[in-house]
Amino acid sequence: TLMALSNKFGHMLLTTGNKSEMSVGYATIYGDMAGGYSLLKDAYKTTVFDLCRWRNDNVPTLGEGFGPAGPVMPERVITKPPSAELRPDQRDDDSLPPYEVLDPILYGLVEEELSVEQLVARGFDRDTVARIERLLYVAEYKRRQSPPGVKLGSRNFGRDRRYPITNAFRTL
């Protein structure tokens, strides 16, 4: 496995999870969460796609910067529908709203600490927001087991935002 190779050669394994996936529990303990550092831990999925497009459009020239001279993220990876790839033809939007809808809801719940009612007042569907809020609370146990990572936003998971994992906690 990658972790075994990491240990054998003394390298740190990086994880690929982002804030959107970690928020709603779309991460596998001892799977894509296994590693020593999470570069994308505090970046929402739409931000990750934006960063990929930006990097592909801003290619360093020889002697100007680090990295290969040319696009580094294939367009097919950016445009492919997101999936945990745990079963054939699975797509994240089979069970979640599109990330263009999910990420603003998560931003409101996590960064701004808004209630379901406040997000509904902003025009989001009540059932969708309530379901996302529930997923956010239920996935707390997974986030506690994730590797450390970069902090980009005002409220990252860990020190900035922790909720109980054992007592069926829900906000009132």
Say what each PLM segment does:
Residues 1-172:
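ATP/NTP-dependent adenylation/nucleotidyl-transfer catalytic domains that generate, transfer
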